[in-house]
C-alpha cells in the first residue's frame, strides 16, 4: 500500500508531500519545535526530520514493538507517549524519552488508547474500554488512578485538549450518530459541537485556538475504517463555520492524533493510494 505524509496549509490550500512509502504508515504528530514528525508503521515508531525527510529514523521503543496509531509528543518536546499491546495483549499507554528508551507504563487498566496531552503537560486524555463501554478518561502524565469523564450510553473516542486547557473535544454517538462534542476537564458541561449528516471523528483543536480539525466520513459509515473517500474539515472553536480543508482517500490512520504544526499554519496527514 502506498502511503504519503502530506503537509497542508489551511490559509492558502497549499500542500507538499514530505514522505512516500509502500509501507502502511499512520498518524503523524508534529514536534513542538516544528522540526520533525513522528508516525507509526509496522508496529514501530518513526521520526521524520523535515530538513531531511527522505530517511525516517526508528525511535527505539524497547519491548514495545506492537504500537498502534495512538501516540504523541509532550508539550515540552522531551517525552514520547505510545499505545502498545506487546506486554498485555491489549493496548496500553506508555511514555519514554523522545529519543528512545525503556517504556514506562502509565495506565494500569487495558485496553487504553492515548489521544491528547494537556497544554501544561500534567495530564493525558485517552479512550478506554471498560466493563460498561468505551469512554473518555484522564490520568496524570506520571501515571496513577484514572478519572472517567463521560458516563457511558454510547461510544466515546478521540479526546484532545483545547490550548487553554479548559476543554476536551471528542467524538461520540451518544446522540445517535458519531458527532463532535466537548467536555470540561472536570467532566462537566458536555456540549455537542457538530450536528450534520456526516460521521465525524478525531477532533484536534489548533494550538492558536482558532479552529478544530477533524475527520468526516460519508453518512452511514460504520466505525472509522481506512481506504474511504473522506474529508478533513475545520470547525470554529465555539461550533459552526464548518468548511472542508482536504478531500482524500484515507480515514483510519490519516489524523488519529494531534497533527497541527506548533504555529497553527499547517497540519500533517496521511493519505493512501487507491487499490
Name what the model sees in each region.
Residues 229-252, 256-273:
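C-terminal closing repeat unit and adjoining cap/tail of repeat-based domains
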Residues 7-24, 50-66, 96-111, 139-155, ...:
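Multi-bladed beta-propeller domains
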Residues 2, 62-66, 216-228, 248-254:
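Short, flexible, glycine-rich and Lys/Arg-enriched loop motifs at helix boundaries
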Residues 37-43, 80-87, 117, 125-131, ...:
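Beta-strand C-termini and the immediately following turn/loop, strongest in propeller blades
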Residues 176, 197-233:
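Loop/turn-rich, solvent-exposed surfaces of beta-rich toroidal or solenoidal domains
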Residues 40-53:
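Beta-propeller domains
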Residues 22-37, 65-80, 109-127, 153-171, ...:
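Conserved beta-propeller blade repeats
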Residues 2-5, 44-47, 89-94, 133-137, ...:
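Structural motif
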Amino acid at each position: 500500500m502506498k502511503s504519503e505524509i502530506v503537509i497542508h496549509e489551511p490559509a492558502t490550500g497549499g500542500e507538499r508531500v514530505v514522505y512516500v512509502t509502500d509501507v502502511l504508515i499512520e498518524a503523524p504528530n508534529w514536534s513542538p519545535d516544528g522540526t520533525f514528525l513522528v508516525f507509526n508503521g509496522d508496529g514501530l515508531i518513526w521520526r521524520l526530520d523535515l530538513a531531511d525527510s527522505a530517511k525516517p529514523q526508528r525511535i527505539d521503543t524497547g519491548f514495545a514493538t506492537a504500537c498502534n496509531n495512538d501516540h504523541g509528543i509532550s508539550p515540552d518536546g522531551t517525552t514520547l507517549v505510545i499505545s502498545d499491546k506487546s506486554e498485555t495483549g491489549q493496548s496500553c499507554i506508555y511514555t519514554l524519552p523522545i529519543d528512545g528508551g525503556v517504556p514506562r507504563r502509565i495506565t494500569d487498566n487495558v485496553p487504553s488508547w492515548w489521544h491528547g496531552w494537556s497544554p501544561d503537560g500534567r495530564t493525558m486524555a485517552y479512550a478506554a474500554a471498560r466493563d460498561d463501554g468505551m469512554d473518555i478518561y484522564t490520568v496524570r502524565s506520571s501515571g496513577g488512578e484514572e478519572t472517567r469523564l463521560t458516563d457511558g450510553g454510547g461510544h466515546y473516542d478521540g479526546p484532545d485538549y483545547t490550548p487553554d486547557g479548559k476543554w476536551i473535544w471528542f467524538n461520540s454517538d451518544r446522540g445517535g450518530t458519531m458527532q463532535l462534542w466537548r467536555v470540561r476537564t472536570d467532566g462537566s458541561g458536555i456540549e455537542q459541537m457538530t450536528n450534520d449528516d456526516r460521521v465525524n471523528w478525531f477532533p484536534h483543536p489548533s494550538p492558536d485556538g482558532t479552529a478544530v480539525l477533524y475527520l468526516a466520513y460519508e453518512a452511514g459509515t460504520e466505525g472509522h475504517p481506512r481506504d474511504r473517500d473522506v474529508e478533513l474539515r475545520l470547525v470554529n472553536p465555539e461550533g459552526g463555520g464548518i468548511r472542508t480543508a482536504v478531500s482524500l482517500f484515507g480515514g483510519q490512520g490519516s489524523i488519529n492524533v494531534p497533527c497541527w504544526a506548533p504555529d497553527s499554519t499547517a497540519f500533517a496527514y496521511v493519505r493512501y493510494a487507491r487499490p
